[in-house]
Amino acid sequence: MRSLLLTVLLNLVVLLATTGAVSSNLNTAVNYASTSKIRFLSTEYNADEKRSLRGDYNNEVTKEPNTSDEERAFSISKSAEYVKMVLYGFKLGFSPRTQSKTVLRYEDKLFTALYKSGETPRSLRTKHLDKASASVFFNRFKKWYDKNVGPS
């Protein structure tokens, strides 16, 4: 019972302490409500300004955030792209003569990921010499590597 009373009192205090609240006496408050502006608690929390989650625009020292230099969290779209790249790798191993635009796009992403992980055509060939369909994959990776990175 005591917690219910405290909850009701807390809600009452919060409602009455709202900034810019006008009293319920309309006869005397009409002039006040029509001539005065709403006062905010602080100029930092002004409702007229744009809100930003990346920085404080009230501070003149703050520069525009550079969103390209930060690493994004692991998301569903990233994981879906990763699964598509892996599936494309399997598809390329089984049917190496596919040349559609989506296949070439995922091939480029797959080869870029391989290059960023430090793989070269020689290192891949030495790791996977025993696979029968590996030669087509390595030839395509070598062509991509020579075109984008330089001769190996």
UniProtKB/Swiss-Prot annotation:
Q: Record's GO cellular component, any one?
A: host cell plasma membrane
Primary site of residence: secreted
Glycan attachment points: 66
> Signal sequence: where?
1-24
Task: Give the induction annotation.
Answer: Expression is induced during host plant infection.
Alphabetically list the UniProt keywords.
Glycoprotein, Host cell membrane, Host membrane, Host nucleus, Membrane, Secreted, Signal, Virulence
Question: What is the residue range of the motif RGD RLK-binding motif?
Answer: 54-56
Motif span (RxLR-dEER)? 51-72
Q: Where in the cell is it found?
A: Secreted; Host nucleus, Host nucleolus; Host nucleus; Host cell membrane
Indicate whether Membrane appears among the record's keywords.
yes
Superkingdom, natural source: Eukaryota
Q: Where are the transmembrane segments?
A: none
Q: Segment W motif: which positions?
A: 99-152
Task: Please tell me, according to the UniProt entry, what happens when changing residue 129 to P.
Answer: Fails to elicit the RGA2/Rpi-blb1-mediated hypersensitive response in host
| Subunit and interaction comment | Interacts with host defense protein RGA2/Rpi-blb1. Interacts with host legume-type lectin receptor kinase LECRK19.
User: Its biological function?
Assistant: Secreted effector that acts as an elicitor of hypersensitive response (HR) specifically on plants carrying defense protein RGA2/Rpi-blb1. Enhances P.infestans colonization of plant hosts Nicotiana benthamiana and potato Solanum bulbocastanum leaves. Associates with host legume-type lectin receptor kinases and disrupts attachments between the host plasma membrane and cell wall.
Annotated domain remarks: The RxLR-dEER motif acts to carry the protein into the host cell cytoplasm through binding to cell surface phosphatidylinositol-3-phosphate. The RGD RLK-binding motif is required for binding to host legume-type lectin receptor kinases and disruption of the attachments between the host plasma membrane and cell wall.
Record's family?
A: Belongs to the RxLR effector family.
Q: What is this protein called?
A: RxLR effector protein Avrblb1
Task: Give the originating organism.
Answer: Phytophthora infestans (strain T30-4) (Potato late blight agent)
